Swiss-Prot record:
Pfam families: Transferase (PF02458)
Keyword Acyltransferase annotated: yes
Disruption phenotype: Impairs the production of emerecellamide A, C, D, E and F.
Family, as annotated: Belongs to the plant acyltransferase family.
UniProt-listed GO biological process terms: emericellamide A biosynthetic process; emericellamide biosynthetic process; ergot alkaloid biosynthetic process; fumigaclavine C biosynthetic process
Family annotation (InterPro entries): CAT-like_dom_sf
Designated name of the protein: Acyltransferase easC
PANTHER family (alphabetical): F21J9.9
Provenance organism: Emericella nidulans (strain FGSC A4 / ATCC 38163 / CBS 112.46 / NRRL 194 / M139)
Active site: H161 (proton acceptor)
Length: 479
């Protein structure tokens, strides 16, 4: 077991990185992801760890934001945070040879693969560096644990959401993979690349509309207690774990089944030029069939369900942000509310098309103006964390989508000994979210949903749902 601090390959002097209004408002928690590799015999685990460190050091010189300390802004009365960087900045980096740990009872890489990688069943503090407690000095922007298992490697990444969104962390992952592969091939990584123009322009997300009222964003609320942590620290939001029994299930959409689903909906539209995207089609299918499986029409027949999905605004602004922008730029969510009776109507291509059209309209109507409205609300609030979401996710009827299917994490080659990841998963058990995971080489992707245990069984028996997606596994909690 080894724990160190991987510093920037080119140290920086003392500096402060100012966070944007969207960075300040976003959920304050550590997002977590795991990358699983099948290790071949061309490199030893010692070699792999050495070159992972080498590659990470160069990557952090390109993206120092994730090597920073996140801390309160001095004398701020609005609970603002900032990123502090300096010559000793780096990322806590822990290596655990799980083959030598009594606590590792989860088997070899082939064992995990046979069970379809049940990473959420592995206790957090075995797989990840334990989450630090907030202190006056702040918190690390990110920390990493490399787990060596028999036949494989599991990289567990935690990053503070205030630093960047999922696209931002994928930029770090892409660069880390590239520099590690070069280091493994040549014995040393390349020099740090110069960031693309606009990659660090967080200041552009401080300018919002004036005199915004909460009525303009009815699914949000102004509430100083909504996110307040009992400790009094505002470096992290209060945790609100689900206390009722639930299941997290994983399903797979192949490229052919995605095409079949989209084709079925296109026949209703009778216009192939307006064919729904994969995300629109899958969102409609899951929203309908999971609502039916949860029997929401029985428990709340006169109610409604809110659908939300996060959007990447990088290309939606004028001028657009580069794809390499580091920061949060995925709020507000696109939102649409429909009667539960409509959502739970018998599943046909026509009824699915109704939901897909609603999802499309919501995303098209969420524009840069929407983003500037939210920024204006944050700027005028007594504290940046007073702006909170007013969603009723699981066990309520609302459904949120986090779509990372267009992130190329499954296709990045990390070099000899590692290759490309065989599995990428979120470890977070966020309430009521549908995750769309990165596409594989064949164009398919996995999804992960949270619902009642009995609802999963109904989904497994749903012939229409399983026509398009294949059940992989499920884990029950709070049973």
């Amino acid at each position: 077991m080894e724990e160190t601090n991987v510093k920037l390959s080119v140290p920086l002097s003392e500096d402060v990185i100012k966070l944007s209004a969207l960075d300040q408002q976003i959920m304050r928690f550590y997002a977590k992801a795991v990358f699983i590799f099948e290790r071949d015999s061309s490199k030893t685990s010692i070699d792999i760890v050495h070159h992972l460190k080498q590659g990470l050091a160069v990557t952090l010189s390109e993206i120092p934001d994730l090597a920073a300390t996140i801390a309160p802004v001095p004398n701020s009365h609005r609970k603002d945070l900032e990123l502090r960087i300096g010559p000793n900045s780096g990322v806590p980096f822990k290596v655990v040879d799980q083959t030598k740990q009594e606590s590792w009872v989860y088997g070899t890489y082939p064992d995990l693969a046979a069970k379809h990688f049940p990473t959420s069943d592995i206790p957090h503090d075995i797989l990840f560096i334990p989450q630090p407690q907030p202190s006056a000095d702040g918190l690390p922007a990110a920390f990493l644990q490399v787990n060596i298992i028999d036949g494989g490697v599991i990289i567990a990444i935690s990053w503070h959401h205030s630093v960047c969104d999922a696209r931002g962390i994928s930029i770090l992952i892409d660069a880390w993979a590239r520099h590690t592969a070069t280091s493994l091939a040549n014995g040393k990584p390349d020099l740090p690349a110069t960031p693309a123009e606009g990659s660090r322009d967080r200041w552009r997300l401080d300018h919002g509309l004036r005199e915004v009222t909460i009525d303009q964003l009815p699914e949000y609320t102004i509430d100083s207690s909504a996110r307040e942590d009992p400790s009094g620290s505002y470096l992290l939001d209060r945790e609100n774990p689900v206390t009722v029994p639930y299941s997290v299930s994983t399903w797979y959409f192949s490229a052919s089944s995605l095409k079949a689903l989209r084709d079925a909906l296109a026949q209703v539209e009778n216009d192939e030029s307006t064919q729904f995207t994969k995300v629109e089609a899958v969102s409609a299918l899951v929203w309908k069939h999971m609502s039916i499986a949860r029997q929401l029409d029985r428990s709340n027949p006169d109610g409604s369900s809110l659908f939300t999905t996060r959007l990447d605004f990088r290309a939606r602004t004028k001028p657009p942000f580069p794809d390499t922008f580091i920061g949060n730029i995925n709020e507000p969510t696109a939102r649409v509310r429909l009667p539960i009776a409509e959502i739970c109507r018998a599943s046909t291509p026509e009824s699915l098309t109704t939901l897909a059209e609603a999802v499309r309209a919501a995303t098209e109507n969420t524009t840069e103006q929407s983003m500037r409205t939210l920024i204006g609300l944050v700027n005028d609030a007594p504290a940046v964390t007073d702006v909170a979401w007013k969603y009723n996710y699981f066990p309520g009827p609302d459904l949120g989508v986090t779509d990372i299917s267009n992130i190329d994490a499954m296709k990045k080659n990390w070099g000899a000994g590692l290759g490309t990841p065989t599995c990428v998963r979120s470890y977070s058990r966020e309430t009521g979210l549908l995750y769309l995971f990165p596409q594989d080489d064949d164009g398919g992707f996995e999804i992960q949903v949270q619902c009642e245990v009995e609802a999963v069984e109904r989904l497994k028996a749903d012939e229409t749902f399983t026509r398009y997606c294949e059940f992989k596994r499920a884990s029950a909690y709070n049973a």
